[in-house]
């Protein structure tokens, strides 16, 4: 197939010849050249449209790939955040349980000493002062700190039910309380996700 430049040149030559002689064959030749030029232009336009369509398909595929990568990054970030929260929550639960146990032991000791003061009418003044000092020592800064920690954990809506060996989770927005056993076959990941999904915000 002749190039565009060749077709134009042929038309120019044909025009020059036509100027010298008014012949039907020259008109036919010009019409043929024009038809070739139009056909070539149509083919070039079709090829351009095909290239544009391919580029659009590639663009769509690229956008889908980017979207998939973003979802993977989001899932990885969420999982990392939950796992990090799992460690913190496990430490919080252990510390909370230890604090509850410590408070129960302290309360038991205090009750024994108070009962001793009430029942023993023959206590001397020195014995009374000694026991009173022991009671005062029960409320030292460490004890006060543990009480504050316990209040903080409870303010988050997490409490331990040691009698039933379970965690109580309060949702302040809904006004509901959910329970979660401390010892079962559930994974730590599930426990953490379950607790955080139900804590009142």
Swiss-Prot record:
Its main location: nucleus. InterPro entries: Ndc80_Spc24, Spc24_Fungi_globular_sf. It is found in: Nucleus; Chromosome, Centromere, Kinetochore. The keyword Cell division applies. Pfam families: Spc24. Component of the NDC80 complex, which consists of NDC80, NUF2, SPC24 and SPC25. Acts as a component of the essential kinetochore-associated NDC80 complex, which is required for chromosome segregation and spindle checkpoint activity. This is Probable kinetochore protein SPC24. It comes from Candida glabrata (strain ATCC 2001 / BCRC 20586 / JCM 3761 / NBRC 0622 / NRRL Y-65 / CBS 138).
